[in-house]
Amino acid sequence: MTDSQQDYQTIRCRSTADFLAALPQLAGFTATDSLFVVLFTGAQAERAVRFDLPSSEEPSESTRLLDLVCDILSEVGAAGDPDAAPALVISSALSFKEAGGTPWRRLARRIERRFRRERIGLRELCCIAPDGWVSYIESGAPQHGHPISEIEASPVALEALVNGD
């Protein structure tokens, strides 16, 4: 193996909880009040990009973020290519309880509308908060989220613990 080659571990995610358990390994770190955009080629995650969340969900606060994300996704060829559809994670310091429901729901809806307009598919759009997680695109998603324990009990999280990741 040359210095430029690396051993990559394949992580198989079968659910959103698995994907959220894998996010720290995919991104290389965790952060709250962030939007993670995970880029894909087919079923393979390629890289992750992190952005600070805006100070509020007001359109005037989030337009610049949406412009930047869409520009990047267009540059990498995600527009019009279902195999390149990204997965987005809103990592929130605001809990479901504090938000009175799903945190950052308005921003998520703006992302969905903008992606439709730009012809960018969505592999996943979800939120992780201190007291739960939810997929915004899951029909019938619980208003107060799924328990964090579902991520912690994910085979992906358990494997990371065993491997010391």
Spans of features found by a protein language model:
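Short hydrophobic alpha-helical segments used for membrane anchoring or interfacial signaling
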Residues: 38-41
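Charged, compositionally biased boundary regions
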Residues: 2-33, 46, 51-165
